Amino acid sequence: AANLKRAHNIDPANVEKIEIGVRDTLLKMCNIQEPVTGLEGKFSMRFTAAMALLGENTGLIANYNEDKVQEAEIVNLRDRINVVNNQDMGKAEAAMSISMKDGSVHQIRTDVETPDSDLDRQWSRLSAKFLDMAGPVIGDAKAARVVELVAGLENAADLNEVTALCKG
């Protein structure tokens, strides 16, 4: 969703409807239609797609809470999203079709197992997600140091400092 938004400068207010096609296994796992809790939001493709199109960080744990899943702008867009079974998809693939109010249609097919073509962007996203998840467990300073060490891993003699930091 975020890639389509960037590529076509999509304004969510001009979206008529969105269809997401995935294999039935993902429908069983990540298809909570109207999440009520933050945890349910994490398992709702409709909710996370709406967040992404609205520019929200879907990798940030703090964005999955009861207030966010009830946020009017997100709910309004979420309710225009339909997730359907598409057995032509691979196990980690999704196809998205965004129909705009002006009649134009934007489509993308992605595989979440495929690395981002922009490795710097991928590193930034993964680092931010790690800091968000590890910070509360081992402390922000230690988490930041782990990211720093992993960034220079090819020059490391061993992993002793990384493992020590991760122990908390």
Give the residues covered by each predicted segment.
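Terminal-appendage/accessory-domain detector
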Residues: 1-168
